[in-house]
UniProtKB/Swiss-Prot annotation:
InterPro entries: Topo_IA, Topo_IA_2, Topo_IA_AS, Topo_IA_cen, Topo_IA_cen_sub1, Topo_IA_cen_sub2, Topo_IA_cen_sub3, Topo_IA_core_domain. Mg(2+) binds at residues 8, 104. The keyword Transmembrane helix does not apply. It comes from Staphylococcus haemolyticus (strain JCSC1435). This is DNA topoisomerase 3. The active site is at 305 (o-(5'-phospho-dna)-tyrosine intermediate). GO terms for cellular component: cytoplasmic replication fork. The gene is topB. Its EC number is 5.6.2.1.
Length: 711
């Protein structure tokens, strides 16, 4: 009898097979005398679409809503059905005695496996592999500590409840809004509050009025002292009056305080922190950063599991510190690593906190030594960020002397503050000792004449627009960016982790860009006209982050077995009915801001101009009519003069390629040039690949609404 191991992806299945010495490669699985390893391809099973319950639902009609199945059904995803059949046959094989779930250790990974097992009506015992890295050692250790699958039943119930609730609310809200206003609109309990976050910041900036304020400074003993005052902002009159009062008054050194203080390194990275800093340093978008970390985790095996919200490690990881340090000998920090290898480590260190680790610990290096030459530029940057933060966390605190000198001048106090480094500690890693200062040699009781008095003018500044990094942080802590009526609501958001999860926030932002609900100009994220209208048209409950916080609060209770998942679904059904009724009864209007005078060749309605990943496209405004045609798009065809990518205008034989340098080619000229480049022979497939013919809509909500619908 054999154990069947179900991984989430082929790459992870191969890693498990290698670690467990399973070498018999077959079509869709790998086996030996003890184990059979197979894999999903992400989700193989998903929630059925509305037309599965009733063919009439294929046509979107407002009067059909809400669509709430009595019992949710699942279907096998068509494009991966072949692999599903393989997995099904293996699960039902009489030679298989048990199933070991080896999908990602988290809510979504549990759902991937359990939907498959439920679909094939599995009756065999289930065990769970729960690991945070896919290195050989981690896999082997994980198999020594397999958990009983029943321990994760509540996790599965929470995952299933989240999936079904998103389907019920998302399908109905999107169909209601789309059919009510005859426009391609999308609503969701995660998307819409994110638009609201961006809008709130935008409104704050728009309504901001700059105010001037003043400070007073003086030179004493060659150093600049600032007036200490209880007023947040002084007026020009206040500052000038004080300056006139004391300009001939002698200053007396009232106190010289010197305190030794310590600063500790920043916490280890969780995913959001890493995404935010990668954007600040390298302008890498959240999705790009996540994909890069995923590569370092799965392919190179040099980083631990990326989708984590924790900044800490568990006590049992103390003994793994040195093997991780050995791996970092391959980096430019070899000398610092050698020094750290000579130290001992304890679970009393600040980085070890069991109670602050839920599913996965912070992102840190694994024991696998990286081949830095084989890493891409992005991979190298991200790996070194994680390595640096890990090394800093193991080094001594930065120790400095905080010096404060108070000089009394009449009834006023002027202060000088400085930090003098005593021990670099963790800051030695980057040698950023920026604390070189003039020697402070004041003594209490000394008298000084003021060398100058200066009134300094300042101006208040508005908050910054969100960028892709700061928006992630705002989604994690929305209570810091929006006004809430009750304090308990802020606590709920804080405790549940805000809008979305570390695993979904990057996708949410990308989806909103694609929906044309938000846009980024010069790194500043703003709400589009369409996004503002969505907020105006949407029921208020869907624009507040409180909804997703309340959901998450209950989902966490379901995970812990303290709340019934069916009660949660019943609440979502009632909520959906309310949302649909609100939209049906609304008297508001939607106005297309991108409507053209071009008539749709299919139905005759005016078409709208939309952005795509590589250009622009005309799409029929009627959501039931799928007519579309290219206006322009970027291609992979290079200009023969300046080598930049050319833009395609039109289609077929009349197509024209233009470059920003002014060079223009017809389709015929392009075909001829391409044939010459390929020795007179080129296939349609090669041409299509070369042209990167991408015609998917960036702001088409139907693609998301009709597929996974993770709103």
């Amino acid at each position: 009898m054999k154990s069947l191991i179900l991984a989430e992806k082929p790459s992870v299945a191969r890693d498990i097979a290698e670690a467990m010495n399973i070498k018999g490669k077959r079509n869709g699985y790998i086996e030996n005398e003890k184990y059979v390893v197979t894999w999903a391809l992400g989700h193989l099973v998903t929630n059925a679409q509305p037309e599965h319950y009733d063919k009439a639902y294929k046509e979107w009609k407002l009067e059909d809503l809400p669509i709430i199945p009595k019992r949710m059904q699942t279907v096998v995803i068509g494009k991966t059905s072949k692999q599903f059949k393989t997995v099904k046959s293996l699960i039902l094989d009489k030679k298989v005695k048990e199933v070991i779930i080896a999908t990602d250790a988290g809510r979504e990974g549990e759902l991937v496996a359990r939907l498959i097992l439920d679909k094939v009506h599995n009756k065999k015992p289930i065990k769970r592999l729960w690991i945070s890295s896919v290195t050989k050692k981690a896999i082997q250790e994980g198999f020594k500590k397999l958990k009983d699958g029943r321990e994760f039943q509540h996790l599965y119930e929470a995952a299933l409840a989240r999936s079904e609730a998103d389907w019920i609310v998302g399908i109905n809200a999107t169909r209601a809004l789309t059919t009510k206003y005859d426009a391609q609109l999308s609503l969701g309990r995660v998307q819409t509050p994110t638009i609201q976050l961006v809008n709130a910041r935008q409104q704050e900036i728009n309504h901001f009025k700059a105010k001037k304020y003043y400070t007073l400074s003086t030179e004493i003993g060659g150093l600049t002292f600032q007036l200490s005052t209880n007023k947040q902002h002084m007026t020009m009159e206040d500052a000038t009056q004080i300056a006139n009062e004391i300009k001939h008054v002698e200053g007396n050194v009232d106190s010289v305080e010197k305190k030794v203080k310590k600063s500790h390194p920043k916490p280890l990275y969780n995913l959001t922190d890493l995404q935010q800093e990668a954007y600040q340093r390298y302008k890498m978008g959240p999705k790009e950063t996540l994909n890069t970390i995923q590569n370092l985790y799965e392919r190179h095996k040099v980083l631990t599991y990326p989708r984590t919200d924790s900044n800490y490690l568990t006590d049992d990881m103390v003994d793994t510190i040195k093997e991780r340090l050995y791996a970092l000998l391959a980096t430019d920090y070899k000398s610092q690593v050698k020094s750290l290898l000579g130290q001992s480590y304890s679970s009393k260190m600040r980085i070890f906190k069991n109670h602050k680790v839920s599913d996965h610990h912070a992102i840190i290096p694994t024991e696998v030594r990286p081949d830095m030459q084989s890493l891409s530029n992005r991979e190298s940057k991200i790996y070194m960020m994680v390595a640096e933060r890990f090394l800093e966390s193991l080094m001594a605190p930065h120790e400095y002397e905080a010096v404060r000198v108070n000089v009394t001048v009449g009834q006023h106090i002027f202060a000088f503050n400085e930090k003098v480094t005593r021990q670099l500690g963790y800051k030695a890693l980057k040698m950023n000792n920026d604390n070189v200062v003039k020697k402070v040699a004041f003594q209490k009781g000394e008298k000084y004449h003021l060398q100058s008095l200066k009134v300094n003018e300042h101006e208040t500044t508005p908050p910054d627009y969100f960028n892709e990094g700061s928006l992630l942080k705002a989604m994690e802590n929305p209570q810091n960016y929006i006004q809430l009526k009750e304090k308990k609501h802020a606590n709920t958001l804080r405790q549940t982790g805000g809008i979305g999860t570390v695993a979904t926030r990057a996708d949410i932002i990308e989806k909103l860009f694609n929906l044309n609900a938000i846009e980024s100009r010069d790194g500043k994220i703003k709400v589009t006209s369409k996004g503002k209208q969505i907020l105006d048209l949407a029921p208020q409950e869907l624009t507040s982050p409180l909804l997703t916080a309340e959901w998450e609060e209950k989902l966490l209770l379901i995970e812990k077995g303290r709340y019934n998942s069916r009660h949660f679904i019943d609440e979502m059904k009632a909520f959906t009915q309310s949302i649909v009724n609100t939209i049906k009864n609304s008297e508001q209007k939607y106005k297309h801001d991108n409507l053209t005078t071009t008539e749709c060749p299919t139905c005759g309605k005016f078409m709208i101009k939309v952005k795509t990943k590589n250009g622009q496209m005309l799409v029929c405004q009627d959501p039931t009519c799928k007519t579309k045609k290219n206006v322009q798009r970027k291609t992979n065809a290079r200009c023969p003069n300046c080598k930049k990518k050319m833009t395609l205008f039109g289609r077929g034989k009349d197509a024209v390629y233009r470059c920003v340098c002014g060079h223009t080619e017809t389709q015929e000229q392009m075909d001829k040039r391409f044939k010459n480049k390929s020795s007179g022979k080129v296939s349609k497939k090669e041409m299509k690949k070369y042209m990167n013919n991408e015609d998917s809509l960036e702001n088409n909500p139907f693609k998301d609404a009709l597929k996974n619908l993770k709103l």
